[in-house]
Amino acid sequence: MIPGSTSGISFSRILSRQTSHQDATQHTDAQQAEIQQAAEDSSPGAEVQKFVQSTDEMSAALAQFRNRRDYEKKSSNLSNSFERVLEDEALPKAKQILKLISVHGGALEDFLRQARSLFPDPSDLVLVLRELLRRKDLEEIVRKKLESLLKHVEEQTDPKTLKAGINCALKARLFGKTLSLKPGLLRASYRQFIQSESHEVEIYSDWIASYGYQRRLVVLDFIEGSLLTDIDANDASCSRLEFGQLLRRLTQLKMLRSADLLFVSTLLSYSFTKAFNAEESSWLLLMLSLLQQPHEVDSLLADIIGLNALLLSHKEHASFLQIFYQVCKAIPSSLFYEEYWQEELLMALRSMTDIAYKHEMAEQRRTIEKLS
């Protein structure tokens, strides 16, 4: 409803009542004319004419709707194809390829070299060539060159690398914007993930080294989203068996992320731990190192705590080791390189705690002796 329309209607009705005595005769004549017109409009010929007219209007509307829908569909397909191309200035560069290939003559190797200089990543190049081949106005000779070029690129590229790069591209673009990173870097990380044979701790550590510890949680979200998208793709990069193994690895990585958050947040919730070292990255590094080298716990702790330990009492040392023992015990044993390593780590920590406790008792005795 338009604001003020109610008052406008009321005002019109008031005016109508004020002038009704002047228009009585005209109203009667008009009413008779309307009755006559209605009679003519209700005749069979008029009804047929109105039906034909309404049918023509409906047909025109439907045709306009179909044309708009087809146009939007084509525009959407074009947009979607180039959205998955992560190279900057994809559309102008694609037109440049078309211009180069439209010039008659030249060897396929020359076209391939120039195309790769514009789109170094094979997934980008394949997407661009496929999109160009969808054009209906191509000369036959140009179409054949594009087909040969596409076939050559596909044959020379590892299928898993090619398909994974295509299937994760939209996720890479989305997360790249979120993380203020080049999407091509994220695409490379997904490719590495599906082909890596490294332990999950090494993969997680590599992400931290590449993106910074602040981004580690979101990077794992990207890998998970890309993997699920890849699984659902029409042309998936891996077999069902391979995807099953990757999903198990993803579960381990998510478990590692949860353990990481619990480990770091618990330790930093204690003031005496912050007194040792208040940096989240330091405790994260310690946990990842313990999963790989639990036998080095003594030296690893010394690296993290450093000279700050000299400023604290034996009681604070013992309290810290008790808390540290509990957070290490909470780490799932499956995250260690060898599951039995966790028990060996806990044994070492119990021994260190016993020593700290003995020092604490000795310190208390000395204090009592001084007071007495």
UniProtKB/Swiss-Prot annotation:
NCBIfam families: LcrE (TIGR02568), PRK15338.1 (NF011866). Residues 1-19 have a biased composition (Polar residues). Its main location: membrane. It is found in: Cell membrane. The gene is invE. The lineage of its organism: Bacteria, Pseudomonadati, Pseudomonadota, Gammaproteobacteria, Enterobacterales. Keywords: Cell membrane, Membrane, Virulence. Gene3D superfamilies: 1.10.150.630, 1.20.1280.240. It is a peripheral membrane protein. Residues 1-46 are annotated as: Disordered. GO terms for cellular component: cell surface; outer membrane; plasma membrane. GO terms for biological process: negative regulation of protein secretion; protein secretion by the type III secretion system. InterPro entries: HrpJ-like, Invas_InvE, T3SS_LcrE. This is Invasion protein InvE. Involved in the triggering of intracellular events that lead to microbial internalization. These events include increase in calcium level, redistribution of actin microfilaments, and changes in the normal structure of the microvilli. Encoded within the type III secretion system (SPI-1 T3SS), it is essential for the translocation of protein effectors into host cells. Forms a complex with SipB and SipC in the presence of their chaperone SicA. Positively regulates the secretion of SPI-1 T3SS effector proteins SipB, SipC and SipD and negatively influences the secretion of SipA, SopA and SptP. It comes from Salmonella typhimurium (strain LT2 / SGSC1412 / ATCC 700720). Residues 21-40 have a biased composition (Low complexity).
